[in-house]
Amino acid sequence: MPTVFTTYQGDLRTEATHLQSGTRIITDAPTDNTGKGEAFSPTDLVATALGSCIATTMGIVARRDGIELPESEMTITKVMSKDAPRRIVRIEVDITMPPSEVFTEEYRAKMEHTAHTCPVALSLHPDIEQAIRFDWKTVGVGS
């Protein structure tokens, strides 16, 4: 059964509908590739998928461990090739984790392993460099 239904709307824009929920995503070609850049580009969604997958799988592992994963933040940077063919060459994910006594060194290592082995990370072509970095805030320091 299909997961997504996508229509090309013209002018380098698509609309994708998640069939189970009805949620819609618009994509637009980026300004550096003759588009308007008014929405996520398809390659932006690839980079976004990596970050979202990392957060989701960390949440799943924490839930299995009986831990409520606190709200965290991440920035995602997508780097495109300078030469042809146009492609993603690097995705940088910088994750800031809030202070929590739950995050022992052992648990931090578990979360970092989870991030590096989420389904999207394992599905991306090995030529795409994945730079996944954590900034673990410490309880009582800078909080």
Predicted stretch roles:
Residues 1-48, 59-143:
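Extended beta-strand/beta-hairpin segments
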Residues 53-54:
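Alpha-helical metal-binding/catalytic segments enriched in His/Glu/Asp
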